[in-house]
Amino acid sequence: PRKSKDAALPTEHKAFTAEETRYILRCLDSEPLKWRAFILLLIDTGCRRGEACGLQWQSVDFDTNTITIERNLQYTSERGVYETLPKNGKTRVVDVSSDVAALLQELRQSQPVTVRWVFTQDDSPEPMHPDTPTRYFQRFGKRYGIEHFHPHKLRHTSASLAITNGADVVSVAARLGHSDSSTTLRMYAHANEDSIRRVGQTVREA
């Protein structure tokens, strides 16, 4: 039978807790600059893996600490790596934290001025292959004992942390590039099932 959209997500899709996220950030201190910037960008903005791979320097504004997400890189065996619009077909401008901006500044200064892409291949100025983060995340998770560490889980984590800290769902939806805020709310609810269950238990015990 077909699962409903509101079916519980498996563990690997749930968000990291605030404590787990802090541990991830500590682990990043030992990682290469490119990956520190990539992972922190995903946590900070909730952007998709392909959107980060498709980010160009012309879309980074250091004066306003914003990025414009206007392309998404995808890969299929038939087409290879190709460029599309973001998933909802719309460009969006997202602000980044001062920590992310500083890492991006450092990354920009480490690259030749002719490089267009923010995240490049190790031996080429071409954009990072969209499958590369998935492989790197697997190694990162094994190295630091983090289960189910993959890019999309950081997207769930970004939404979870934002809403938990008081951001309204409509604003978070716009930041994530969701065309419907109910998608964001489902993501938050699924990512925080354990917390919601504890709230229910607290109410019943009151």
Positions of predicted regions on the chain:
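Basic, Lys/Arg- and aromatic-enriched nucleic-acid-binding interface segment
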Residues: P1-L55, D63, Q74, K90-T91, ...
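DNA/chromatin major-groove-contacting recognition/catalytic segments
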Residues: I24-C27, E78-T84, N165, R186, ...
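Short, polar N-cap/turn motifs at the start of nucleic acid-interacting alpha helices
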Residues: S59-T66, A167-M187
